[in-house]
Amino acid sequence: MFQARPAPVSDFEQLFVAPADESVPVAPSRWIALTDLQHFDADPQWSRDGKMVYFTSNRDGYTCLWALRLDSVTKRSAGQPFAVQHFHGTPRAHTLYPTFSVGPDRIVISLDQLQSDLWMMHLPEGH
């Protein structure tokens, strides 16, 4: 799984998965797009069970944490991305690039604010 800017004139990036092949680089024609090229989607991480991808996106005007359910067989998106955690409002609105780590039942998020913050949120059932 990776992020890329497939259109050289685009300001946005999108998320892809590709079959693993250690012998040769995987041709872009074999990349499977998970998100569209309408937003800046970045920092993808698998959920522990492989059924979900968590990522940061500016799709609501702020850089927030989003998720996307995947088809367990094809690894294609199985629906629309949905917000997991918003970072709107002062001072969180000034967060540019949160970093995060996905655990079995929680996500730990590091925010770049005037003073560094470390957040931990429990994932609801089904996440």
Predicted feature locations:
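A flexible loop/linker signature enriched in serine peptidases of the S9 family
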Residues: 1-25, 35-41, 56-67, 72, ...
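Blade-level signature of beta-propeller repeat domains, shared across WD40, Kelch, NHL, RCC1
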Residues: 94-127
